[in-house]
Amino acid sequence: MDNGIFIVATIFIVNILYVTIYTVRLLLTMKGYRYLAALSSVFEMIIYVVALSLVLDNLNNIANVLAYAIGFGVGIIVGMKIEERIALGYITVNVITKEYNLDLPNQIRDLGYGVTSWLASGRDGERMMLEILTQRKNERKLYKHIIEIDNGAFIVSSEPKQIHGGFWVKQVRK
């Protein structure tokens, strides 16, 4: 294999690894996983120094710089895909039902979710408001269940910053 192609491929692959670890580490930091984030930063910096030195030692070839830049972009996508699969943390799902249905919260509770519900008033009449806390990895499954039960439901999710008490108090890891 030609040495130039080998260097370009190495720069590309090493930078994908670096940025993937960087992206996952950043997300771990934001989720509060301090020690895991710190450990991953050690590997991140080792890979970064290797990738950067390869580029700086071979600046005479524009393909090396392009491989570095493209590897950076691909690494962000790969890192985000990995984080989506890991799905760390919890989400709060707010549901506004199409119609007032007293049985809906119990149907969702029967699926293993903690649900708080109350009467809400919408433009077209009474609705039921539900608040559900679940692990992010269960988000799509929860959406599917809600839509099966109430296809016209309005669903919004957000990521809680802190959790204290309630249904999840014994299960939530700090």
From Swiss-Prot:
Keyword annotations of the record: Cell membrane, Membrane, Transmembrane, Transmembrane helix
Annotated InterPro entries: DUF2179, DUF5698, UPF0316
Domain of life: Bacteria
GO cellular component: plasma membrane
Membrane topology note: Multi-pass membrane protein
Subcellular localization(s) per the UniProt record: Cell membrane
Transmembrane segments: 4-24, 36-56, 62-82
CDD domains cross-referenced by the UniProt entry: YitT_C_like_1 (cd16381)
PANTHER family found in the cross-reference section: UPF0316 PROTEIN YEBE (PTHR40060:SF1)
Family: Belongs to the UPF0316 family.
NCBIfam families on file: PRK04164.1-3, PRK04164.1-5
Protein name: UPF0316 protein Lm4b_01790
